[in-house]
Amino acid sequence: MSDPAIEVAPVPVASPAKAKKEKKPKSDKPKKPKAPRTHPPVSDMIVNAIKTLKERGGSSVQAIKKFLVAQYKVDTDKLSPFIKKYLKSAVEKGQLLQTKGKGASGSFKLPAAAKKEKVVKKVTKKVTEKKPKKAVSKPKTGEKKVKKTIAKKPKVASATKIKKPVAKTTKKPAAAKPTKKVAAKPKAAPKPKAAPKPKVAKPKKAAAPKAKKPAAEKKPKAAKKPSAKKA
Protein backbone atom coordinates (compact mmCIF):
# COMPACT_ATOMS: atom_id res chain seq x y z
CA MET A 1 0.00 0.00 0.00
CA SER A 2 1.28 3.36 -0.89
CA ASP A 3 1.78 5.87 1.92
CA PRO A 4 -0.57 8.76 1.78
CA ALA A 5 1.07 11.97 0.61
CA ILE A 6 2.10 14.05 3.56
CA GLU A 7 1.08 17.56 3.15
CA VAL A 8 3.82 19.92 4.18
CA ALA A 9 2.57 23.11 5.67
CA PRO A 10 4.08 26.09 3.96
CA VAL A 11 6.72 27.80 6.12
CA PRO A 12 5.84 31.41 6.56
CA VAL A 13 8.47 33.49 4.87
CA ALA A 14 9.85 36.19 7.09
CA SER A 15 8.50 39.41 5.82
CA PRO A 16 11.06 42.12 5.37
CA ALA A 17 11.24 44.49 8.31
CA LYS A 18 9.10 47.44 7.88
CA ALA A 19 11.09 50.41 7.02
CA LYS A 20 11.29 52.72 9.97
CA LYS A 21 9.45 55.86 9.58
CA GLU A 22 11.88 58.49 8.55
CA LYS A 23 12.03 61.28 11.00
CA LYS A 24 11.10 64.53 9.48
CA PRO A 25 14.04 66.88 9.55
CA LYS A 26 13.46 69.62 12.02
CA SER A 27 13.14 72.91 10.36
CA ASP A 28 16.15 74.95 11.32
CA LYS A 29 14.29 77.92 12.54
CA PRO A 30 16.47 80.54 14.12
CA LYS A 31 15.83 80.54 17.83
CA LYS A 32 14.65 83.80 19.18
CA PRO A 33 17.34 85.26 21.39
CA LYS A 34 16.25 85.65 24.96
CA ALA A 35 15.50 89.18 25.91
CA PRO A 36 18.39 90.51 27.97
CA ARG A 37 17.73 91.14 31.62
CA THR A 38 17.12 94.73 32.41
CA HIS A 39 17.61 94.18 36.11
CA PRO A 40 19.95 92.24 38.42
CA PRO A 41 18.87 89.00 40.15
CA VAL A 42 15.91 89.16 42.53
CA SER A 43 18.12 88.36 45.53
CA ASP A 44 20.41 91.32 44.85
CA MET A 45 17.48 93.68 44.34
CA ILE A 46 15.82 92.68 47.63
CA VAL A 47 19.07 93.00 49.61
CA ASN A 48 19.72 96.41 48.08
CA ALA A 49 16.16 97.51 48.90
CA ILE A 50 16.49 96.54 52.58
CA LYS A 51 19.89 98.26 52.84
CA THR A 52 18.72 101.53 51.35
CA LEU A 53 15.41 101.66 53.23
CA LYS A 54 17.22 101.16 56.59
CA GLU A 55 14.07 100.61 58.64
CA ARG A 56 14.70 99.70 62.27
CA GLY A 57 11.80 97.28 62.51
CA GLY A 58 12.57 95.74 59.13
CA SER A 59 11.19 96.43 55.65
CA SER A 60 7.79 95.05 54.71
CA VAL A 61 7.13 93.15 51.47
CA GLN A 62 5.07 96.04 50.14
CA ALA A 63 7.87 98.52 50.83
CA ILE A 64 10.37 96.24 49.08
CA LYS A 65 8.12 95.94 46.01
CA LYS A 66 7.67 99.71 45.83
CA PHE A 67 11.42 100.16 45.92
CA LEU A 68 11.94 97.63 43.12
CA VAL A 69 9.41 99.42 40.90
CA ALA A 70 10.99 102.82 41.53
CA GLN A 71 14.61 101.73 41.29
CA TYR A 72 14.64 98.93 38.70
CA LYS A 73 11.30 99.54 36.92
CA VAL A 74 10.21 95.88 37.07
CA ASP A 75 6.80 94.25 37.13
CA THR A 76 6.42 93.09 40.72
CA ASP A 77 3.31 91.04 39.86
CA LYS A 78 5.42 88.76 37.65
CA LEU A 79 8.28 88.69 40.13
CA SER A 80 6.12 88.11 43.23
CA PRO A 81 6.59 84.28 43.25
CA PHE A 82 10.36 84.75 42.96
CA ILE A 83 10.33 87.38 45.69
CA LYS A 84 8.42 85.09 48.08
CA LYS A 85 10.68 82.15 47.27
CA TYR A 86 13.84 84.13 47.99
CA LEU A 87 12.49 85.58 51.24
CA LYS A 88 11.65 82.11 52.60
CA SER A 89 15.01 80.60 51.64
CA ALA A 90 16.95 83.63 52.89
CA VAL A 91 15.29 83.40 56.31
CA GLU A 92 16.06 79.66 56.54
CA LYS A 93 19.72 80.20 55.58
CA GLY A 94 20.11 83.10 57.98
CA GLN A 95 20.72 85.67 55.24
CA LEU A 96 17.68 87.66 56.40
CA LEU A 97 15.97 88.16 59.74
CA GLN A 98 12.16 88.12 59.87
CA THR A 99 11.07 90.65 62.46
CA LYS A 100 7.31 90.35 61.86
CA GLY A 101 4.94 87.82 60.34
CA LYS A 102 5.55 84.31 59.06
CA GLY A 103 6.64 82.79 55.77
CA ALA A 104 6.98 85.29 52.93
CA SER A 105 4.82 87.92 54.61
CA GLY A 106 5.87 90.36 57.25
CA SER A 107 8.98 92.50 57.69
CA PHE A 108 12.56 91.54 56.95
CA LYS A 109 15.90 92.86 58.10
CA LEU A 110 19.55 92.17 57.29
CA PRO A 111 21.72 90.58 59.99
CA ALA A 112 24.61 92.60 61.39
CA ALA A 113 27.22 90.70 59.34
CA ALA A 114 25.41 91.23 56.04
CA LYS A 115 25.32 95.01 56.46
CA LYS A 116 29.10 95.17 56.08
CA GLU A 117 29.03 93.61 52.63
CA LYS A 118 29.27 95.98 49.69
CA VAL A 119 26.22 96.64 47.53
CA VAL A 120 26.48 94.73 44.24
CA LYS A 121 27.03 97.16 41.37
CA LYS A 122 24.86 97.02 38.27
CA VAL A 123 26.54 95.56 35.17
CA THR A 124 25.04 97.01 31.97
CA LYS A 125 25.34 95.30 28.60
CA LYS A 126 26.96 98.31 27.00
CA VAL A 127 30.04 97.89 29.14
CA THR A 128 30.34 94.18 28.34
CA GLU A 129 30.03 94.78 24.59
CA LYS A 130 32.72 97.45 24.52
CA LYS A 131 35.29 95.33 26.32
CA PRO A 132 35.92 92.76 23.52
CA LYS A 133 36.33 95.55 20.96
CA LYS A 134 39.06 97.12 22.99
CA ALA A 135 40.75 93.78 23.50
CA VAL A 136 40.78 93.11 19.72
CA SER A 137 42.18 96.52 18.85
CA LYS A 138 45.06 96.24 21.32
CA PRO A 139 46.96 93.39 19.58
CA LYS A 140 46.78 95.26 16.26
CA THR A 141 48.56 98.25 17.66
CA GLY A 142 51.09 95.95 19.27
CA GLU A 143 51.88 94.22 15.94
CA LYS A 144 52.49 97.52 14.18
CA LYS A 145 54.90 98.61 16.86
CA VAL A 146 56.83 95.35 16.60
CA LYS A 147 57.15 95.67 12.83
CA LYS A 148 58.50 99.19 13.08
CA THR A 149 61.07 98.28 15.66
CA ILE A 150 62.26 95.23 13.68
CA ALA A 151 62.70 97.32 10.51
CA LYS A 152 64.75 99.95 12.30
CA LYS A 153 67.15 97.56 14.02
CA PRO A 154 69.22 96.50 10.90
CA LYS A 155 69.80 100.16 9.97
CA VAL A 156 71.30 100.87 13.31
CA ALA A 157 73.49 97.77 13.04
CA SER A 158 74.90 98.85 9.64
CA ALA A 159 75.70 102.31 10.92
CA THR A 160 77.66 100.91 13.79
CA LYS A 161 79.66 98.61 11.48
CA ILE A 162 80.87 101.56 9.36
CA LYS A 163 82.01 103.44 12.39
CA LYS A 164 84.01 100.50 13.74
CA PRO A 165 87.25 101.13 11.71
CA VAL A 166 87.65 104.53 13.31
CA ALA A 167 89.91 103.88 16.24
CA LYS A 168 88.50 105.54 19.20
CA THR A 169 90.94 106.49 21.85
CA THR A 170 89.51 105.01 24.87
CA LYS A 171 90.65 106.73 27.95
CA LYS A 172 92.20 104.32 30.30
CA PRO A 173 90.81 104.67 33.69
CA ALA A 174 93.31 106.46 35.87
CA ALA A 175 94.96 104.03 38.17
CA ALA A 176 93.61 104.59 41.52
CA LYS A 177 96.43 105.78 43.72
CA PRO A 178 96.67 103.72 46.80
CA THR A 179 95.71 105.96 49.56
CA LYS A 180 98.32 105.82 52.23
CA LYS A 181 96.71 105.37 55.47
CA VAL A 182 98.44 107.73 57.82
CA ALA A 183 98.63 106.09 61.14
CA ALA A 184 97.02 108.38 63.56
CA LYS A 185 99.55 109.62 66.04
CA PRO A 186 98.70 108.46 69.47
CA LYS A 187 97.72 111.36 71.55
CA ALA A 188 100.27 112.22 74.16
CA ALA A 189 99.23 110.85 77.44
CA PRO A 190 98.40 113.70 79.77
CA LYS A 191 101.18 114.38 82.22
CA PRO A 192 100.32 113.21 85.68
CA LYS A 193 99.68 116.09 87.91
CA ALA A 194 102.33 116.58 90.51
CA ALA A 195 101.23 115.13 93.76
CA PRO A 196 100.68 117.92 96.24
CA LYS A 197 103.63 118.18 98.60
CA PRO A 198 102.68 117.35 102.13
CA LYS A 199 102.89 120.36 104.27
CA VAL A 200 105.82 119.95 106.61
CA ALA A 201 104.87 121.00 110.05
CA LYS A 202 107.41 123.50 111.15
CA PRO A 203 108.73 122.50 114.59
CA LYS A 204 108.11 125.11 117.12
CA LYS A 205 111.23 126.52 118.56
CA ALA A 206 111.71 124.83 121.89
CA ALA A 207 112.42 127.25 124.62
CA ALA A 208 116.04 126.98 125.51
CA PRO A 209 116.27 125.31 128.90
CA LYS A 210 117.75 127.49 131.44
CA ALA A 211 121.12 126.15 132.50
CA LYS A 212 120.95 125.23 136.10
CA LYS A 213 123.92 126.18 138.03
CA PRO A 214 125.68 123.13 139.33
CA ALA A 215 125.26 122.78 143.02
CA ALA A 216 128.38 123.43 144.91
CA GLU A 217 130.05 120.23 145.60
CA LYS A 218 130.12 119.49 149.23
CA LYS A 219 133.54 118.91 150.47
CA PRO A 220 133.93 115.56 152.14
CA LYS A 221 134.26 115.79 155.80
CA ALA A 222 137.68 114.92 157.12
CA ALA A 223 137.76 111.46 158.54
CA LYS A 224 138.05 111.46 162.21
CA LYS A 225 141.29 110.18 163.41
CA PRO A 226 140.96 107.13 165.61
CA SER A 227 141.50 108.03 169.14
CA ALA A 228 144.51 106.41 170.75
CA LYS A 229 143.52 103.61 172.96
CA LYS A 230 144.56 103.95 176.48
CA ALA A 231 147.11 101.42 177.68
Curated annotation (Swiss-Prot):
One Pfam family, short name: Linker_histone
Cellular component aspect of the GO annotation: nucleosome; nucleus
Renumbered residue ranges of the record's region Disordered: 1-44, 124-231
Basic residues bias spans: 145-171, 178-213, 221-231
Chief place of localization: nucleus
Tagged with keyword DNA-binding: yes
Domain H15: 38-112
Subcellular location: Nucleus; Chromosome
Gene Ontology MF terms: double-stranded DNA binding; nucleosomal DNA binding; structural constituent of chromatin
Bias (Low complexity) ranges: 1-17
One Gene Ontology term from the biological process aspect of the record: negative regulation of DNA recombination
Keyword Nucleotidyltransferase tagged: no
Keyword field: Chromosome, DNA-binding, Nucleus
Protein family (similarity comment): Belongs to the histone H1/H5 family.
Function (record text): Histones H1 are necessary for the condensation of nucleosome chains into higher-order structures.
Name of the protein: Histone H1
Provenance organism: Chironomus thummi thummi
